[in-house]
Design a protein with these regions (language model features):
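Structural microenvironment flanking redox-active thiols in thiol-disulfide oxidoreductases
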Residues: 35-82, 93-100
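A short beta-strand-turn-helix
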Residues: 1-27, 34, 44-48
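Hydrophobic beta-strand anchors of alpha/beta hydrolase catalytic cores
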Residues: 28-29, 113
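Extracellular/periplasmic catalytic domains that process cell-envelope and extracellular macromolecules
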Residues: 20-23, 54-55, 79-81, 105-108
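Active-site-proximal beta-strand/loop segments in catalytic clefts of secreted hydrolases
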Residues: 31-34, 63-66, 90-91, 117, ...
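Thiol-/selenol-based redox modules, centered on thioredoxin-like
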Residues: 108-145
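Short acidic-hydrophobic, aromatic-tinged amphipathic segments that line or gate anion-handling sites
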Residues: 9-11, 84-95, 126
Length: 145
């Protein structure tokens, strides 16, 4: 996986690299699908750890497959998400395809959540529905401090 890959940043309305969005160090990348239970569960699962993720200070880049998916997402349904989230879309699904191929995933189900660093080392991956994902991510980032 390459942190130099581009995505479309929904706030700035520009293409940028994951590295430019996250700065050096570790980050969370979540390749998500709107209005799907596994993605909804993931978002609800990280909300209780909002303060911990904000204290960690690293970015969480959440990417939809394309603009139409981003438009269907109801952000207002998810209160109390960390302010370190960068919302975007995956340009030509480059990021998803690289993670899918390089991590040898066998199912194209979203969400796919990774914790990686800007030297392209993935230290955590989860795909699909996973109970306690917020806690798992919190445990991983605490070990990285």
């Amino acid at each position: 996986f390459n942190s130099e890959n581009l995505f479309f940043d929904l706030e700035s309305q520009t293409q940028r690299s994951i590295l430019s969005a996250t700065g050096r160090g570790y980050y969370v990348l979540a390749l998500i699908a709107p209005n799907s239970e596994p993605t909804n569960h993931f978002l609800r699962d990280i909300a209780p750890y909002k303060d911990a993720f904000e204290k960690w200070g690293q970015k969480m880049v959440l990417l939809f497959a394309d603009a139409s998916e981003a438009e269907r997402f109801q952000k207002g349904d998810f209160a109390n998400l960390p302010n370190t989230i960068v919302w975007g879309t995956d340009i030509n699904q480059t990021n998803f395809n690289e993670v899918y191929t390089n991590m040898k995933l066998t199912n194209p189900t979203r969400p796919v959540i990774i914790v990686a660093d800007t030297f392209n080392r993935i230290v955590f991956i989860s795909q699909g529905y996973s109970i306690g994902l917020g806690e798992q991510l919190n445990n991983v980032i605490n070990k990285l401090k």
